[in-house]
A protein has these predicted regions:
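Carbohydrate-associated surface elements
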Residues: 31, 146, 165
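A short, charged, and often flexible helix/loop element on the N-terminal side
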Residues: 39-67, 79, 118
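A short beta-strand/loop micro-motif in the catalytic core of glycosyltransferases
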Residues: 135-144, 160-161
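Short N-terminal targeting/anchoring amphipathic segment
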Residues: 65-86, 100-103
Length: 178
């Protein structure tokens, strides 16, 4: 994944696991120039840079996303931290893939970030949007019990914990640098 952060690391590890188990996946997201990851196709889309958060863009759904999804015939559609692109894709998936289960994963407390970036007045609206989008999914995954409690306090339901653990190949006592 070109952008390195907690969300892309988690997505990368998920794709590595799916690949190692022989599962197929397709990734839709920002156009980074990446066309595949471990043999999984990556379909990018245009985005407008967010000035207060370098490296992040507001991306737009494309009709070819739905066509590619229909051709791919997924068993499940996973929305990673759905806010902007997820808000566009969830209704399209409900319409064009009505029998395919939808799951989402919660990674970033974006509503709280609004306050940190000086637009705290957006926090209630962002929680409302987040609650609505996650409610359109059959299951919501989050990384910890404390995150689950926070999401439940905000009205988000059907939450399961998807623990991340530690990559013991990368983080070992032998690889320690003093």
């Amino acid at each position: 994944m070109p952008k390195i952060d907690g969300v892309t690391r988690t997505l990368g590890r998920l794709l590595e696991h799916l690949h190692s188990e022989g599962h197929e996946a397709i990734v839709f997201g920002p156009d980074t120039g990446l066309k595949e990851y471990l043999g999984h196709p990556v379909v990018g889309t245009f985005g407008i840079p967010i000035l207060v958060y370098p490296g992040l863009k507001l991306n737009f759904a494309r009709l070819r996303f739905i066509r590619r999804l229909q051709q791919f015939r997924p068993d499940v559609v996973h929305f990673v931290d759905p806010i902007w692109l997820g808000a566009q894709m969830i209704p399209l998936c409900k319409r064009y893939l009505p029998n395919v289960p939808r799951v989402s994963s919660y990674h970033t407390n974006l509503p709280t970030y609004a306050s940190l970036f000086g637009v705290g007045f957006l926090e209630p609206a962002m929680w409302s949007l987040s609650r609505y989008l996650h409610s359109q999914c059959d299951m919501v995954f989050c990384p910890s019990e404390s995150t689950r409690r926070m999401l439940q306090s905000r009205g988000i339901q059907n939450i399961e914990i998807w623990g991340r653990g530690v990559d013991t190949d990368m983080f070992t006592p032998e690889a320690r640098v003093v």
